[in-house]
Structures are given as C-alpha cells and as structure tokens.
Amino acid sequence: MCNRYVSPEAGDMERYWHVGARQPWRAAEVFPRAPGPFLRADREKPLSHELVIGQWGLVPWFAKTAKLTYSTNNARFEEITTKASFKSSWSYGKRCIIPAVSFDEPNWESGKNVWWRFRRADGAPWGLAGLWNTWTDKTTGEVVESYTMLTLNADIHPLMNRMHKPDPKLGPDRQDKRSVVPIELEDVDAWLNGSPEAAAALVRLAPAQVFDAGPVAP
C-alpha cells in the first residue's frame, strides 16, 4: 500500500500528458486525505483528459461526510468489483491517472522501517492507475473531488515483494505484498476511455527494471 508520494509541477504534468493549463499546482508531497492532482477523461471533450485537484482518499457516493473514518486512499484491484467504496467508480468507468515524481514504501529487511523511494529509471513521471468520484454534500451543496490509488498483489515481484513489514503468522507466499499499477503513456487513452475489459488488461506489475529504487537519504 502506498501512503506517500510526490506529485509533479503543474507545467510538467501539462507537457507530459498534454493537458491544458487549468489547475495551478506546485510539486508537493501528498499524504492520505490531502489534496493532490489526478487526470481523468474530460466530460466536455470526448477522447481528451483534464487535470483535477482532489482529495487522496475516495469519498464514495453513500458517504454522509467527506471526512471518512476509514481509509480509501488505496484500492485492491482484486476487490474493486465487490467493495462498496469502489465498485461504483469502476462500473461507471471513473478511472484516473495519478501523476507522481516518486512514491515511498517501507522496507523492513533490517528489522526496522527504512523508507525506500521509487522513481522511474527513464526519468519520466509515474502515471499510476486510480479511480475517482465526485461527491456532493446534500446539506451544504459542497462538491468534493476525490481519488484512490489501485494496488495489485506483488508477492512474486522481485522488488516490490521486499516492501512492507512481513506478517510472521503468514507464509512467504501469503503475505499479500502490494504494488502500485503504472500506466504507460501510450496506454493512457485506453485506461481513461476504454472498455472495462481493455482497462483491466492494463492492470499488471511493472518489470523490476522500470524502477529506480533505494533507501531515502536521512
């Protein structure tokens, strides 16, 4: 599960993903329930996408308040068709791209938590798969944009399976280590605008050589 990442500058996102300059944003660390930028299909321009600022932590349609008492910043891909918080966004095609310069994960191989930072080896930003929702407060009329980051089981991944604290009660093949899901630039349109089947085919683990990863400097 990812709980910390760094978003790019607005200008970098606009150039890389070819979105218009509609949302001012400075590069920043993003944490759960904090605001962050994401890209989604533009509802006014078919086959285009827009940059939106929303809360990292999806607010589902049935929520009574945007201040949730449970975590929705990550969504297991294996559960998105059944879990109440996410199945509506998936079924309605509310898929998004979460731009990131890097993301951090905890490594416990030394017996204590050492944060590792993950960048792309080619220097490009990450485009991480996510889901979004627009929630409206029925009392005040406030509109809240929000998003969640998809994760996939990474028990067999040579790099991502080294992250997070092992559960001593479970065997090595039952740890359910997780990885974010990168969407390559050439697949963005299929992810944002394609059929559920086409989008699901893009949910896969990235090869280890895609990553430039190591401990965060103290």
PLM features: residue spans?
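Conserved SET/PR-domain catalytic core that frames the SAM/AdoMet-binding pocket
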Residues: 84-110
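A residue-level signal for conserved active-site and pocket-lining positions in enzyme catalytic cores
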Residues: 2, 38, 98, 128, ...
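C-terminal accessory segment of soluble enzyme catalytic cores
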Residues: 1, 13, 73, 155-218
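A contiguous pocket-lining binding segment that forms or flanks enzyme active sites
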Residues: 115-164
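Residues immediately flanking
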Residues: 100-102, 152, 185-186
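Short Gly/aromatic-enriched secondary-structure transition segments
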Residues: 52-56, 111-120
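A glycine-rich, hydrophobic loop/mini-helix early in the fold
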Residues: 48-90
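Extreme N-terminus nucleophile/cap motif
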Residues: 1-57, 196-201, 207-211
